[in-house]
């Protein structure tokens, strides 16, 4: 399902999540969203069926896999400062967060 969503995005410009494809299969999307997704899926299926046996753009997309976001890493000293601040004040205001961020840079 994730690969289908990625393939749709690469081929037609609309990336759909695995959840959206799953909900489409289970008929749990709104009528409007079903109408938007059905023509794209039909087109993708026709292309996939017509290209059996020969490598195509769909095969290339599947080989690429889903791009993953880079994992965020926080320095130990910064993590300690954040944890101690949020223990003192679990719900800081926006200005406090900005001040804290500036002090940690």
From Swiss-Prot:
Q: Tell where it localizes.
A: Nucleus
Domain of life per record = Eukaryota
Q: What family name appears in the similarity comment?
A: Belongs to the POU transcription factor family. Class-3 subfamily.
Which source organism does the UniProt entry give?
A: Xenopus laevis
Q: Which residues bind DNA?
A: 67-105
**One MF annotation (Gene Ontology) recorded for this entry:** DNA-binding transcription factor activity, RNA polymerase II-specific
Keyword Protein biosynthesis assigned to the entry: answer is no
SMART domains per record = POU (SM00352)
> Which Gene Ontology CC terms are recorded?
nucleus
Instruction: Name it.
Output: POU domain, class 3, transcription factor 3
The POU-specific domain extends over 1-49
UniProt entry keywords in alphabetical sequence:
Activator, DNA-binding, Homeobox, Nucleus, Transcription, Transcription regulation
